[in-house]
């Protein structure tokens, strides 16, 4: 039995709220149960030095957690003077996931920054960030089209992500913090709307997992991501 009484293949309640802030070209509050992440997309008319003069854009991401997004307060990374390895890993994952579905050549020399700030954490913050950031990116692209900054959408596909794992011997979908902290296996899966895998990150935390368990986790992830892709479409009115 899962602590939340969910079935093994059951997502937490997912909510995607668009236009959550007024300044960013795209902004979304995404909720996976008690995990809440604010995702904003900001358009900037310049690119990193390595892309200057190539008439190509860039999409990148930053990730952070508010000091009291968890059970006990933690210092801001800015106050500590450096980002943790975990933060760097997560924001690179978010950036890779979004770049997998955007044609950077259609952006011109512009950068879209995705900022994902965890307001409240209860497991699955990186996968919630990817799922919400895509919707914010979609809205930023809509802003660019409406303001004649670009002539056609650079988005090639949708992208969403979910966690899966083995908890008390059973493969389960969308782990919350209690499950994540006690699971035998933890895996994050990122997929596109057309069914392609962008990334699979899986680690045995306790007992090594067998091929059958891995196959079942991937089946659960695919099913969960299909639901998330539909949630994204509903939020975007597509």
From Swiss-Prot:
Keyword hit for Transcription regulation: no
Annotated protein name in UniProt: Ribonuclease PH
Catalytic activity, as annotated: tRNA(n+1) + phosphate = tRNA(n) + a ribonucleoside 5'-diphosphate
InterPro entries: ExoRNase_PH_dom1, ExoRNase_PH_dom2, ExoRNase_PH_dom2_sf, PNPase/RNase_PH_dom_sf, Ribosomal_Su5_D2-typ_SF, RNase_PH, RNase_PH_bac-type, RNase_PH_CS
Family: Belongs to the RNase PH family.
Enzyme Commission number: 2.7.7.56
One Pfam family of this chain: RNase_PH
Function: Phosphorolytic 3'-5' exoribonuclease that plays an important role in tRNA 3'-end maturation. Removes nucleotide residues following the 3'-CCA terminus of tRNAs; can also add nucleotides to the ends of RNA molecules by using nucleoside diphosphates as substrates, but this may not be physiologically important. Probably plays a role in initiation of 16S rRNA degradation (leading to ribosome degradation) during starvation.
Subunit and interaction comment: Homohexameric ring arranged as a trimer of dimers.
Top-level taxon: Bacteria
Amino-acid positions noted as binding phosphate in the UniProt annotation, renumbered to this chain: 86, 124-126
Region (Disordered): 64-86
Keywords, sorted A to Z: Nucleotidyltransferase, RNA-binding, rRNA processing, Transferase, tRNA processing, tRNA-binding
Gene behind the chain: rph
Molecular function as annotated in GO: 3'-5'-RNA exonuclease activity; tRNA binding; tRNA nucleotidyltransferase activity
GO BP, one annotated term: rRNA processing
